[in-house]
Amino acid sequence: SMVKPVEIVESFLQALSEREIGLIMSFFDERSSWQNVPHPPSNGIQEIELMFSPIIRKSSKVQWDILSSAYAENRAWLERVDRFWIAGIEYSVQCNGVFEFDLPRGKIITVRDYVDLGEWRERLALAQLND
């Protein structure tokens, strides 16, 4: 039986909380893209890994909280607070994302995330994430 979008989302959030980059990346393939709108998307495994890797590596804890969600066919709309703990300090960012899935393969194919990256980068500059 085909996997449901909500099951992919829950498994993906679990992988993030385990901070296991191989497990996180197993949800994507070469067709996948993740866009922090309005910035250009990260396309394919390598680019998406480059996006996730620094923050996952720096964080001692990761927790993405879903505030509200809607599911239809192969899509999910997720209002979230993405929370990262770096050197004992919590950094959180509010996001609204549209996720599209390849249900037979259980993959995340596209993400369009709407987030104020300016504010996020300002906060993270304090954590020296770009070292």
Where are these regions (language model features)?
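Short, low-complexity N-terminal intrinsically disordered segments enriched in polar/charged residues
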Residues: 1-30, 127-131
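Hydrophobic pocket/interface hotspot
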Residues: 9-12, 24-25, 32, 44, ...
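Helix N-cap and loop-to-helix transition residues
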Residues: 4, 20, 43-44, 116
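A beta-strand edge to alpha-helix "cap/lid" segment located at domain peripheries
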Residues: 4, 53-131
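A solvent-exposed, acidic/Ser-Thr-rich amphipathic alpha-helical stretch
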Residues: 21-75
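Phosphate-binding glycine-rich loops and adjacent basic patches that engage nucleotide phosphates
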Residues: 8-18, 42, 59-63, 82-85
